[in-house]
Amino acid sequence: MDEAGTAAFRPGCTVSKIETDAATPVRALLQVSGLTKWYGDEIALADVAFDVNVREVLGVIGPNGAGKTTLLEAVAGLQPVDTGNITWRGAPLPRARRREFIFYLPDGIRPYQDQSVARVLAFFAGVYRRSGAHVAEIVAALGLGSVLAKRVHALSKGFNRRLLLALALIAPHPLVLMDEPFDGFDLRQSRAIGDLLRRIAQDGRALVLAIHQLGDAERVCDRFILLSGGRLRGQGTLTALRQRTGLPAASLEEVFLALT
């Protein structure tokens, strides 16, 4: 099966264990500190720091060009950075080992586009030793049954996004990074996908979602990091961000505008 898309999407990495100091309890699953990335003379990320906790949905919020995709790619190990540290449960996580723990779902790729949806799902299920019943449950949850025989290149944007979400569900990685997971869905579909993402987190995984639809973000995410011009402008729950801005009834959009 030929691969189309990005190296981040290449399956086959089993989830590993990384040595930690058992005497020191660590709540955060992933810790990012001092992450800085330059493109020539242009700053893409400036000293970005945040944590991701188990069973948490963290929203990365910002306009186009804010650095959201660059941040996800840097955390996933696809982008080298100039400075910064990433740890997993308190232990350093080298770039070469990120794929063992982190599944990155880019925006807009079409994986294995000359293959049928059914074959792509079966391939991923085989790689990660998932049962047919498990895959059938995912297919039903995402409404993919009607397109199983279609080739990936023939899928609409919405169905391609559903396929990508299905592959993220099949993969066992404890941390999933998603770039614009609601892109291509109408309001009803976005709500259903949001509910599904919440269930994924509640089942013990952590999600980091780069989102520009602030209504979806406000409904789905537990905490937020606000990016503008590659710089972290604020982070925390919506309640905490409201307190920081002195706007007790503000929406996420109003908080973002106040801080940027």
Please give the residue ranges for each predicted region.
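A short, surface-exposed alpha-helical micro-motif characterized by mixed small hydrophobic
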Residues: 217-219
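Catalytic Walker B motif of ABC-type/P-loop ATPase nucleotide-binding domains
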Residues: 176-180
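Helix-to-loop junction immediately C-terminal to a conserved catalytic motif
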Residues: 76
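Conserved ABC ATPase "signature" region
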Residues: 122, 126, 132-148
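Conserved ABC transporter NBD signature motif
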Residues: 84-98
